[in-house]
């Protein structure tokens, strides 16, 4: 029984301790309920919260940015996530905290109270006003704080002059849509936009964001309407565009410059130009999706791309002209004197170009050696002389002069006399071609050359005279003349001092055959002589002096054709050398033009690059 009494006392004590707490909570809730009933009984949310109709409702306005979502250059629109801060006083919503259990503030639905109709004037898309109506914080003195979040798409005039190094000034204009300045006036909470909770953007950085109070009279109305305009100065982060836009443009420009450094002989200049032009065209198709499509101003990068396009097009035109100059020849074009003077003399010195002359000198040396070889007295080897000739010299008893009937083969016994011999056994004496006559000798004999003549042999031009002789031991009653010639190359000296008298003149020489044959076989053979008189006419010493400059020539027609062929080859090489020289001059002119435009395009490319970066740098955007 005592246990039950003690247990009942404990329950009474517990209830006594709990009931005051519940009574306090119930009293607090009852106080707010009573407060709400008191505040909103007969409250009209459509009327301005002023005691006198002439009073002005002061609305303190502020803005806090949470995120810069996007800046659309094409649509010229800025999307932001902001908190709209608003404060005003409502005299109808006041109370004494002592009457309501010291309740100093309550949260009330914003739909139940009067709100200023503040909207975004420069709204581009979506709702002008706040759509998410959060609860307002009401204080006992009638002060109301309302901070609803909002995502605004405000129109922004995008200036893409220095794109991608641009800096934009986007504005957000807030004001009452229906109440003029006499009804509602705005007061800025802070001079700057609150960025304490700002989430940094990956493309834009906010340089500054300030708010300015303005009053404006619109054409539609006679009243003055106040507004607070926030200016967001934002700058683009150019790293993405530098890597994906500017550097490729610079590389394309460099490729265009390299076109003029490429030799014309490789044949890839036009291919490189067309490849650069096609790559730039494809690149421009991608750029149009990035660059703002506005006609108000041309972006700087657009100007640079247009400059590069013109750059590449001009390089193609110039390359075609350079290739045309490079492949010119004497058969198609004649090089004017001013071109030779300007592009072969003046401009290369200004460009510090030095033309190599090794190939041209080698060609000249080759042709000179060919001419020297054809005129050389030792063109043929001495060992190739025919051994079938025999000599018999019989000087005339009437005179010291060589007899016209002396054997021509006598001088063949002297191996030191001939200076040039052909492999075919042909001899020639080099001199200008005077008229030739043919004479006959009743006795086959050869007149030997005098010592003065043989020692004065030197270089000369080779001509052909045919020598006839009879073979050894032919059949009886028949004499056969065969064409056999051995080349002697010599020049007649102006004077001969051998034995104190003049040598025999070439005009007095007679060409005869001397062969071993039977005495009873007379024969007669015709030969060619140089300005000879009739056969058997003796030559005079004075005649010899009068014909000093003439030379005796003995050459066969075949040898003459061979020598003429060599001269033809030499002349052909000389003509080819002249053509080659003119072609090389045209090629050098093309190279000089290439070098001129190489330096010009390098300078223009550097100036264009500087023009791309200098204006933004001067404007303080880089």
Swiss-Prot record:
Which key words are in the record?
Calcium, Cell membrane, Disulfide bond, Glycoprotein, Ion channel, Ion transport, Ligand-gated ion channel, Lipoprotein, Membrane, Metal-binding, Palmitate, Receptor, Signal, Synapse, Transmembrane, Transmembrane helix, Transport
Q: Where in the sequence does UniProt note compositional bias of the Low complexity kind?
A: 390-407
Q: Which CDD domains match?
A: LGIC_TM_nAChR
Superkingdom of the source species: Eukaryota
User: Can you cite an annotated GO cellular component?
Assistant: plasma membrane
Segments carrying the region annotation (Disordered) are 380-477, 497-516
**What this chain does, per the record?**
Component of neuronal acetylcholine receptors (nAChRs) that function as pentameric, ligand-gated cation channels with high calcium permeability among other activities. nAChRs are excitatory neurotrasnmitter receptors formed by a collection of nAChR subunits known to mediate synaptic transmission in the nervous system and the neuromuscular junction. Each nAchR subunit confers differential attributes to channel properties, including activation, deactivation and desensitization kinetics, pH sensitivity, cation permeability, and binding to allosteric modulators.
Oligomeric state and interaction partners are given as:
Neuronal AChR is composed of two different types of subunits: alpha and beta. CHRNA4 forms heteropentameric neuronal acetylcholine receptors with CHRNB2 and CHRNB4, as well as CHRNA5 and CHRNB3 as accesory subunits. Found in two major stoichiometric forms, LS (low agonist sensitivity): (CHRNA4)3:(CHRNB2)2 and HS (high agonist sensitivity): (CHRNA4)2:(CHRNB2)3, the two stoichiometric forms differ in their unitary conductance, calcium permeability, ACh sensitivity and potentiation by divalent cation. Cells produce predominantly an (CHRNA4)3:(CHRNB2)2 nAChR.
NCBIfam families in the record, alphabetically?
LIC
Entry protein name: Neuronal acetylcholine receptor subunit alpha-4
Q: Which organism does this sequence originate in?
A: Gallus gallus (Chicken)
